[in-house]
């Protein structure tokens, strides 16, 4: 049989047998296409968690919370599979909605949307929600903002206060926002105004409240995390604003005189394609040209529906890291020199 450098690693067909999710993922490392990429993402994420003094960022876009991914993200926060979350405001609004005891509902993408509108039901592809309940949450956020009073703060600071308030109201720790508050995991929302949280804050503004979310402070704070971390890894669920907000930290640090060399690990689950030129499908190889990803970084991009990938990946990681005593970063925001980071089990 002819062998050369290209034919030293044969594929191994998947056997059907009793095994764990992590064992299935290990087996898929010897298959092909996006199945192998999914397995490689688990391998890379697991290695990233074992890497000493690494700060793991997650960018969360798409309607992941309405689609049922909320407890997966909060589990990853509690178990410190991620150390900093950058999210769309919509995901966090929907998280607050459920934290307050309300629901999203199994629906159909074939439903009559005019009838849904008449009944006050909103549709997110095949998920339904009650518009009146959303508006109640909008006004609750407005009321909460008025309780805070007239301040200027970053979205991280605002989400911390919101998590504290939801916890005070008895929200369970399966909430993303509450878990982040209790476990000192910062949440940044770079497009907070583009969400129902922004609607709530607009209601408060119309009532006369002067509360400003300082988005430039957001940029500064998250860049400080990158600058003061020994190494960094990124995980993107979808792309969009959260992806670029994290990616640009390396460029900003370089412009400010701290050329860190790019993120050391990079994983993405996306259904977008690179040939359209948009960031959501942009490859990590392209990001190397910008200095956002280190040339030697472990890079895995999986072209997949994230609602398929996340449950599989989360269960595999849970099995692999169950006994791992990870050294996770602890953030101290009020020091004399700004942010300080310590690494503790």
Swiss-Prot record:
One of its GO terms (cellular component) is cytoplasm. Its cofactor is NAD(+). Keywords: Hypusine biosynthesis, NAD, Transferase. Its EC number is 2.5.1.46. The keyword Glycoprotein does not apply. Pfam families: DS (PF01916). Pathway: Protein modification; eIF5A hypusination. It catalyses: [eIF5A protein]-L-lysine + spermidine = [eIF5A protein]-deoxyhypusine + propane-1,3-diamine. It comes from the Archaea. One of its GO terms (biological process) is spermidine metabolic process. It is an enzyme of class 2 (transferase). The keyword Transferase applies. The active site is at residue 292. One of its GO terms (molecular function) is deoxyhypusine synthase activity. Catalyzes the NAD-dependent oxidative cleavage of spermidine and the subsequent transfer of the butylamine moiety of spermidine to the epsilon-amino group of a specific lysine residue of the eIF-5A precursor protein to form the intermediate deoxyhypusine residue. Belongs to the deoxyhypusine synthase family. NCBIfam families: dhys, PRK00805.1. This is Probable deoxyhypusine synthase 2. It comes from Methanosarcina acetivorans (strain ATCC 35395 / DSM 2834 / JCM 12185 / C2A). The gene is dys2.
